[in-house]
Structure formats: C-alpha cells, structure tokens
Amino acid sequence: MSDMEKPWKEEEKREVLAGHARRQAPQAVDKGPVTGDQRISVTVVLRRQRGDELEAHVERQAALAPHARVHLEREAFAASHGASLDDFAEIRKFAEAHGLTLDRAHVAAGTAVLSGPVDAVNQAFGVELRHFDHPDGSYRSYVGDVRVPASIAPLIEAVFGLDTRPVARPHFRLRRRAEGEFEARSQSAAPTAYTPLDVAQAYQFPEGLDGQGQCIAIIELGGGYDETSLAQYFASLGVSAPQVVSVSVDGATNQPTGDPNGPDGEVELDIEVAGALAPGAKIAVYFAPNTDAGFLNAITTAVHDPTHKPSIVSISWGGPEDSWAPASIAAMNRAFLDAAALGVTVLAAAGDSGSTDGEQDGLYHVDFPAASPYVLACGGTRLVASAGRIERETVWNDGPDGGSTGGGVSRIFPLPSWQERANVPPSANPGAGSGRGVPDVAGNADPATGYEVVIDGETTVIGGTSAVAPLFAALVARINQKLGKPVGYLNPTLYQLPPEVFHDITEGNNDIANRARIYQAGPGWDPCTGLGSPIGIRLLQALLPSASQAQP
C-alpha cells in the first residue's frame, strides 16, 4: 500500500493486528470499494483482565468431579475477568477520534461495538472495504492487514464485522428420494425414522427427569420457528410444550421463511429435539446474522445472559476451521472458555461433510466451533433400534450426496491433556502432527434413520449432526436437574469415565469421497464417533457424587 493509498492519518503510528488477514472465497470477484453513506458496525474484542487466572481456574475445576466444582457467578465475572473500564475508555477515545461511535460495551464479554460511515471505518482500522460477488451471494471484505494506532493495539485481540461473508452452515440433512432429491416425509412413509423419544429410549436417557430448572440456549444464524408448528409437534408426542423464547442479537430476529427445506429446518429441528426430551427446561433461541461478528455476539450474549442464564448452549452451525481468520477463532475460543468458567456446557455439531468437511483442497478438515477444546463435539451415527433397544449402530456415511459425520484431527488446536490417553491418531494431513481429536461423542444423525419432526407445519424426516447437539443438550439438562447444579465443562470428565457409559461404535468410516478411508471407527475413541453414543442412565450414575467418591 503506497503512502497515497493509506486510509489512516499520516501522523499516527500503526501496528498490524495479527491473525486478521483473510483469503477471499474461491470464485469471488472483486467489484470495487464500498462507497456511500452506509453505516458499518464493527465488534472489537478487548483483552481480558487476569486471563491466565481464568484458564487456571477452569483447569482446576475440570479436574474435580462435577458435583464438587465451583463455577464463577455471572454477576461477578465482569469485574474479575471482563475487559477493564480503562480499556473501554481508550476505545471510546479511539472511536471518537476517527468519527465512530461506541454503540455498546459488554464488559463481561470484553466486546465493544463501534459504528460509523465507511470512510471512518476504513481510516480507523487501516483497511479499504470492498464488495465481492460470489455464486453463493455477495459480501463485504478487505484485502491485506488490519492496522490500528500503536497506542491501542495492545488492547485489541480481534476485530469482527469488517468481513460479512457467511462463516457457518447448518448441519442438518433432509431425507432423500432414491434419485437424490430431497423430500418432505408423510406420516405413512418408511418406518426407519424415529421421534426424539424413540432415540432417547434407545440411548437409555434417565427417566423421571425433564430438565426442570435448566435453560438451553440454541444459537441460530438464520430462519425462525413457527409457534403453531411447535405446538403441533409437542402435542403429537404427548409431551408438554417447553417455554421457548427468542433473543435478538445484532438486529436478527425470529424470521421463519415458510420453507421447510431452508434454515427453518435447522431452527425447528433444534427446538423440537431439545424440547421433546427436556420439556421442563426453558429454550432460549439466540438469533444472529450469519457473519463472524454475529456468531461471536450470539455466543457471548448467551453465555453471559443475566436474564435467561443458560446452563447449556447448543450449536448446530459451523464451518471448516481453516476458513476462519486465526484471530476470530481465538476470540470465539475465549468465549467458550468463559462458558467453562461459568459452568455452561457448550455442545456443537461436528459437521455433515465427512473427513474433509466439504473442502475441495485434497486435505482433511474438522469443523469449528466443534474443534474447540471447550466444546463437546457431537458426531453422527446410523442407528437401527427396535422396542427401545439398539440392534446396530455404525458410523453415518452416505457418501458425497448423502453426507457423513465430520471428524478428524484439528490443525489449529493442540491435543488436550484429557485426550492424551484416547489414542488420537496424528492428522492425516502431511506434516500436520497431533491435534485435538473430533468428535467427543456421537448420536443418531443419518437421515435414513432420522428424526421425525414438523417444520413449518409439514411433517418431515431430518438427520445430520445438527440433531445430535440438541439431543445431548437435553441429556445434560436432565443430568443437571438430578445433580442440582450444572456439570459445566464436561470434556475432561467424559474421558475419565468407564467405557461402559458409552455404546462403542466400531464399524464404518467418514471418508465421504471413499478415498483412503483414513479415519476409521474402532474400539475406544475414534475420529468418526468419538467415545461413542450415550448410555444415558450410566452416564448420570457415573457423574453422581456417590460414583465419584467410590472411584480410587
């Protein structure tokens, strides 16, 4: 960039913010600079107070049995580990000096939302915002680095909102016709579909519990739910309808499209699976734009929500971890660390595009946010059950047209200590080495053995790992209810439990392209189904205080 092209004031010394360079999407066409009086909103993630102490606290608590853990309170978190008020004051000065306004400050999450005209944003962050056209839709982005005044660079960990491309896709799959088209299923269609109640029975969810006293947060980046459809569905199952509330994030709201094949399918699948199995819990649905800023703000809003106070967060959206800017992944992971400290269990779908996660670069990829070590990654199986008993369960893999469970080895997150004895293989990518293994657990996800749900008033069958995240969310809600407190960060605990609390999946692979079949199911943990599908009552018993006291 020449001196003539610099968008910032010449007298300011600038520093590059690491991890913000973005590669443009394949087939994207640069259509020139963003102009006009459009107002741009940007989320700035500030450094936290005593971040090392927070990580140490989470590690200490994770080593304890769930009933013995001491979680931080939301009310005190902002003062102890949020961004400092002095840093917010500096960001306000920075904003005002560059023609921006500070619209919102979230102390606990450590985020500041700034807005202003295009020219002001360009000058403040040392970028030139540009329009890009793409077959999947146009978006705004920038080329090169993000640069801020050297005086405030140490305060800033990430900047979200300069790039508006969708960062995630919903991980659900509709059942297909034989010729490969998708179809809505009538009540009289093939019997290889289950209600959530059927699946819970097969997985031996503990009975006599309904999630009372819990709040399950569901993150949605599009679509909406129809209250009539939800009422129809829960009535058909003979269960009480849960309380469902919507929360608007960054202007997004509950906006059902009326198209059961669109994002409404994701939203209502999530609510219906979680609500059917934990009808006593409150379901809080956080709607946000499908951008990096929207996704982050939805998660931080849910995790730090002082009104609904979720104890569980279910995420059915994600994308290949290498499609995220490094700074964005780090900031999202920080939000998941917050959740762990607050005793919030976060679950995410592992993806529906096999070991490549839908990428076409010849490499193996895992999905984010499932790859975060603070997230319980949920893979997918093909379940055959009868009369409440599992007859056969294998890795879900229907090939490139039908989808397959995500899973593999992260290229970004190192191998966590709690996975060191799980025999996580090295990454299949050349020279990549070890890393966080994905998924942690699994459940029914094959559309051929999918979930019968009602989407926009239409009965259909849906699969995908999207169904597994709310399935486990409901199980955690029941466990929390029984324990009388949230289990919180579950990952380290699950890897210490006896293998008998899971149904081990030992057949299949997630090589969607049928190449080397590098990631295979096998005894114990594997990169297709993790530790296996749950045996719910055994999992609960293993987490009860009496069980932990009996262990050596």
Curated annotation (Swiss-Prot):
According to the record, the residues making up region (Disordered) are: 1-34
The catalysed reaction is: The enzyme preferentially hydrolyzes peptides having an Ala or Pro residue at P2 position and prefers such charged amino acid residues as Glu or Arg at the P2' position. In the oxidized insulin B chain, kumamolysin preferentially cleaves between Leu(15) and Tyr(16)
The pH response of activity is noted as: Optimum pH is 3.0. Is completely stable in the pH range 2.0-4.0 at 50 degrees Celsius for 24 hours.
- Residues holding Ca(2+): D504, I505, G522, G524, D526
Q: Which InterPro entries match?
A: Peptidase_S8/S53_dom, Peptidase_S8/S53_dom_sf, S53_propep, Sedolisin_dom, Tripeptidyl-peptidase_I
Q: What is the effect of changing D504A?
A: Retains auto-processing activity and 3% of wild-type proteolytic activity
Ranges for domain Peptidase S53 come to 193-546
* UniProt keyword annotations, A-Z: Calcium, Hydrolase, Metal-binding, Protease, Secreted, Serine protease, Signal, Zymogen
Q: How is the cofactor bound?
A: Binds 1 Ca(2+) ion per subunit.
Mind telling me how this protein is modified after translation? Autocatalytically processed.
Summarize what the entry records about the temperature dependence of activity. Optimum temperature is 70 degrees Celsius. Retains 60% of the original activity at 80 degrees Celsius for 10 minutes, but loses its proteolytic activity after 10 minutes at 90 degrees Celsius.
- Gene Ontology terms describing biological process: proteolysis
Q: Which GO terms describe its cellular component?
A: extracellular region
How its function is modulated: the record gives: Inactivated at 22.4 and 37 degrees Celsius, but not at 60 degrees Celsius, by aldehyde-type inhibitors such as acetyl-Ile-Ala-Phe-CHO and acetyl-Ile-Pro-Phe-CHO. Insensitive to the known carboxyl proteinase inhibitors pepstatin, diazoacetyl-DL-norleucine methyl ester (DAN) and 1,2-epoxy-3-(p-nitrophenoxy)propane (EPNP). Not inhibited by Ala-Ala-Phe-chloromethylketone, an inhibitor of the human tripeptidyl-peptidase 1.
Tell me which cofactor or cofactors this protein depends on: Ca(2+)
Specify the effect of S466A. Answer: Loses both auto-processing activity and proteolytic activity
- Annotated compartments: Secreted
Instruction: Please tell me, according to the UniProt entry, what happens when changing W317A.
Output: Retains auto-processing activity and 4% of wild-type activity. Shows consequent structural changes
- Functional summary from the UniProt entry: Thermostable pepstatin-insensitive serine-carboxyl proteinase. Preferentially hydrolyzes synthetic peptides having an Ala or Pro residue at the P2 position and charged amino acids such as Glu or Arg at the P2' position. In vitro, specifically hydrolyzes the Leu-15-Tyr-16 peptide bond in oxidized insulin B-chain. Additional cleavage of oxidized insulin B-chain at Phe-25-Tyr-26 is detected at a considerably lower rate. Can hydrolyze collagen and the chromogenic substrate azocoll. Shows lower activity with albumin and casein. Shows very weak tripeptidyl peptidase activity.
Q: Which PANTHER family match?
A: PROTEASE S8 TRIPEPTIDYL PEPTIDASE I CLN2, TRIPEPTIDYL-PEPTIDASE 1
How it assembles, according to the record, is: Forms monomeric and dimeric crystals.
Q: What is known of its domains?
A: The core of its prodomain resembles the prodomains of the pro-subtilisins and of the pro-protein convertases. The prodomain may stabilize (by interacting with helices h4 and h5) a folding intermediate of the catalytic domain. The catalytic domain has adopted a mature-like conformation already in the proform.
Report what the protein is called. Answer: Kumamolisin
